[in-house]
Regions:
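Structural motif
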Residues: 74-76
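A structural-propensity feature for long, helix-poor, extended segments
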Residues: 37-66
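A structural signal for small-residue-enriched, beta-sheet-centric alpha/beta enzyme cores
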Residues: 47-48, 78-225
Length: 225
């Protein structure tokens, strides 16, 4: 089963729904396909449950109900992420087998989608598409501090002070200072709509090829879209 925890009304968060629209769904065709095609594909289901702000239901509750009813052997969860470094935005596709916490990147902690809660293995796929204001300021401060350290004589008290600044402590301090002025501000690149489309194609193609043993990239490009 393939599911997502994204808000399709927000461009940088619409990665999941765009991937779902390109997944080769075959569960409803099981037993009705010709033998040669039946051997080439596996039963796959896909769902885009939305977010709690749209449905009023926890994404995890919807997914748990589906898992309990369908008993899939594997869940692939796709989500847009918040980057902790500005140079990571739209620059990496992250995968893990430890599940995903929908909304955690923007401060909305929801029910975990992991094996402990769902009872089946969960592969999480995510792409950082936004960054918060504190991270942007933190990255700028890092560049300034690196230049100051480079120009400061080693061994001096000022040098040691600069060198001893902890990354997480600095980030938390910046977030607390900016909080009253910017609130929960997140930004995304202006070309995010085109980037999300390309990323959705890459992820969907990869999932289709991985799940269906008889499907190649050439087949997808020829018949899918």
């Amino acid at each position: 089963a393939v599911c997502i925890g994204c808000n399709w009304n927000i461009t940088p968060d619409a990665l999941g729904p765009k991937v779902i629209s390109k997944i080769l769904v075959t569960r409803h065709l099981s037993g009705t396909l010709p033998v040669e095609i039946e051997k080439a594909v596996r039963p796959v289901a896909a769902v885009s449950p939305g977010v709690m702000g749209i449905t009023g239901i926890e994404t995890g509750e919807i997914v748990k109900g589906i898992v309990d009813k369908l008993h899939p052997s594997l869940l692939i969860a796709i989500d847009a992420l918040a980057a902790r470094r500005s140079n990571r935005i739209n620059a990496a596709i992250q995968m893990s087998d430890t599940g995903v916490a929908p909304g955690a990147g923007v401060g909305n902690r929801r029910m975990l989608l992991d094996e402990a809660h769902l009872g089946i293995p969960v592969i999480a796929i995510g792409v950082p598409t936004v960054v918060d204001a504190a991270t942007l300021v933190n990255d700028t401060m890092d560049c300034i501090l690196e230049e100051m350290i480079r120009q400061t004589e080693k061994g001096t008290a000022f040098y040691e002070t600069l060198a001893d600044l902890e990354q997480e402590e600095k980030y938390q301090m910046i977030a607390e200072i900016l909080g009253p002025y910017t609130g929960n501000l997140f930004v995304t690149p202006k070309e995010v709509d085109a980037v999300v489309d390309r990323l959705a194609n890459i992820i969907a193609n990869s999932i289709n090829i991985a799940l269906h043993p008889g499907i190649t990239l050439e087949d997808i490009n020829k018949y899918a879209w």
